[in-house]
């Protein structure tokens, strides 16, 4: 076992006095009013007063990136969903996030979404597109286009389908991760990353939900900030936080007038690693390839290739100095490509406070790190690479002989429960390159030859400070969906496949029993690596293959 390495940041930041920030956060949160995330007796993080006052103002739900809610989701008996229970908009591929606004003066809300080609604003109640801002001049994507694409994914031999799927994937997703993670602030500004900066969009007419979309402001990296934007978040005192794939952390004022940046520890590894990934044509596999989590005390958490790291913001300085509370801890990385998960924070009351990822081993392990002080006399789990590791459990989906399992999804955190899914294709075509398996679980995820099976819950016991497997369900399929948990309905939700149909699956959070299946339909309802979530009305929303989808299973 290695002791936690001591980082040596450029510039040598001094100690951080965070008491003022904590007090300010409490005051601002009180003034902002209770958000859904504020309830739950310490199970959920405090609402960030600088995000839109809604159930989903940022990817992964909130600044803590937990992918869970106290709001009750669907609990009706399983049944095939009728047309009246399904709403969708044909916006075109690539609209992964669906970000909910605060209420406008008249009580209306809108949903913001984006692709590499456009920014859209939709009516919250109907999903009707209210306004569009074109980034690229492209023909409108139609239902006929959607039908043609869906048919092509089913036609011909396996080789024909694989070739078509590979080509389609290149047109559907951005070349990098810059525009994947977005957020909406309390003033209605929708922030989208670009390769070397960030752009804010908003209403051209203030207070009008049907207003055209205006580009409010753009900011490009100065010469001393390197890399492309990967993750985005916002501190509890209102500073935008960005991570770059070169290993830099950035805080930026919301008017783009002030900026702070720091190199993360071990970022000297990034250039060679990124060059190797580029040479192997592995787009999206850079040294940092997931978004970032932020806590209410100024902690900023990012997972790099083989390293889990914390930077600290105190309102005027950004630091990676251990004396300020920052740290960097190694995690196991046998694949050599790091974690596929965005860090998720766990523990918000007076109990244990942890940050959770899956590691980079071929058989991934859910790995939890102490966010703040490592308890005196702490003995980490056997095999841990740092004293900061609090818990580490391999994900086997109930098969003790399993040797490989990876997921590209964040760990769902609900209280001290953690839910993960299997994203390994059931089989691989002969000669198919393993690094291209995303094609199998995305565009071809409804083919039973490739559909992955398995959902697993782990639980942290704050009394014994141990992590254990709580249950495994091997019936559940979740080819590419980012799952979601509702403590209000005691369910974990995902979108999988049953009998060729994309299907909403509801699993009891306490027991792992598959409580209900709601078949939806064909390729249009493929989640395509988007996250699902529960809105305040208890409906499921996600980004489908051809546009946003909303589900409201009713009692038959």
Regions found by a protein language model. Give the residues of each.
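Sequence/structural signature of beta-propeller modules
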Residues: 31-160, 554-556
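Repeated scaffold domains used in trafficking and secretory/extracellular systems
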Residues: 93-103, 139-150, 168-183, 223-233, ...
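Residue-level detector of Asp-centered blade-edge/turn motifs that repeat once per structural unit
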Residues: 104-107, 184-186, 234-237, 294-297, ...
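Structural motif
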Residues: 116-123, 127, 195-205, 246-253, ...
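Asp-box/WD-like beta-propeller blade repeats and closely related beta-sheet repeat scaffolds
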Residues: 154-178, 195-197, 203-236, 258-289
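Long, internal scaffold/assembly segments composed of regular secondary structure
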Residues: 293-404
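Loop/turn-rich, solvent-exposed surfaces of beta-rich toroidal or solenoidal domains
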Residues: 354, 408-513
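Blade-level signature of beta-propeller repeat domains, shared across WD40, Kelch, NHL, RCC1
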Residues: 526-556
């Amino acid at each position: 076992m290695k002791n936690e390495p001591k980082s040596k940041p450029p510039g040598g930041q001094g100690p951080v006095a965070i008491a003022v920030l904590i007090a300010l956060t409490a005051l601002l949160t009180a003034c902002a009013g209770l958000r859904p995330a504020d309830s739950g007796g310490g199970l959920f993080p405090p609402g960030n007063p600088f995000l839109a006052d809604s159930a989903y103002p940022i990817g992964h739900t909130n600044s803590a990136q937990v992918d869970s809610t106290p709001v009750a989701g669907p609990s009706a008996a399983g049944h095939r969903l009728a047309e009246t229970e399904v709403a969708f908009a044909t916006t075109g591929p690539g609209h992964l996030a669906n970000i909910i606004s605060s209420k406008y003066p008249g009580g209306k809300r809108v949903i913001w979404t984006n692709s590499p080609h456009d920014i859209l604003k939709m009516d919250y109640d109907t999903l009707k597109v209210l306004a569009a801002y074109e980034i690229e001049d492209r023909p409108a994507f139609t239902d006929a286009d959607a039908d043609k694409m869906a048919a092509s994914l089913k036609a011909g031999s396996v080789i024909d389908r694989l070739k078509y799927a590979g080509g389609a994937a290149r047109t559907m997703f951005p070349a990098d991760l810059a525009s994947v993670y977005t957020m909406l602030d309390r003033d209605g500004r929708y922030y989208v990353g670009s390769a070397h900066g960030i752009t804010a969009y908003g209403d051209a007419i203030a207070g009008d939900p049907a207003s055209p979309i205006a580009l409010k402001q753009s900011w490009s990296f100065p010469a001393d900030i390197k890399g492309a934007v990967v993750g985005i978040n916002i501190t509890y005192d209102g500073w935008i936080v960005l991570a770059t794939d070169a290993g830099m952390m950035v805080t930026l004022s919301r008017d783009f007038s002030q900026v702070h940046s720091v190199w993360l520890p071990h970022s000297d590894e990034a250039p060679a690693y990124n060059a190797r990934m580029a040479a192997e044509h592995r787009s999206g596999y850079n040294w940092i390839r997931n978004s970032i989590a932020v806590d209410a005390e100024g902690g900023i958490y990012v997972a790099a290739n083989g390293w889990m790291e914390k930077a600290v913001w105190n309102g005027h300085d950004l630091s990676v100095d251990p004396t300020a509370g920052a740290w960097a801890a190694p995690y196991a990385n046998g694949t050599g490509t790091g974690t596929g998960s965005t860090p998720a924070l766990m523990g918000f009351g007076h109990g244990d406070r942890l940050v959770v990822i899956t590691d980079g081993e071929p058989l991934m392990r859910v790995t939890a790190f102490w966010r703040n002080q490592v308890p005196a006399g702490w003995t980490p789990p056997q095999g841990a690479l740092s004293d900061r590791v609090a818990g580490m459990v391999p994900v086997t989906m109930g098969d003790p002989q399993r040797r490989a399992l990876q997921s590209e999804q964040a760990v769902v955190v609900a209280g001290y429960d953690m839910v993960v899914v299997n994203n390994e294709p059931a089989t691989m075509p002969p000669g198919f390159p393993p690094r291209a398996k995303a094609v199998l679980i995305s565009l071809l995820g409804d083919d039973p030859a490739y559909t992955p099976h398995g959902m697993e819950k782990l639980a942290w016991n704050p009394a014994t400070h141990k992590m254990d497997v709580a249950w495994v369900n091997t019936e559940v399929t979740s080819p590419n969906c980012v799952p979601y948990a509702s403590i209000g309905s005691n369910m974990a939700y995902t979108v999988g496949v049953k009998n060729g149909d994309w299907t909403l699956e509801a699993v009891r959070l306490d027991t792992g029993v598959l409580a209900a299946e709601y078949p939806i339909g064909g390729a249009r309802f493929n989640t395509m690596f988007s996250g699902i979530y529960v809105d305040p009305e208890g409906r499921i929303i996600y980004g489908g293959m051809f546009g946003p989808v909303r589900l409201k299973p009713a009692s038959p």
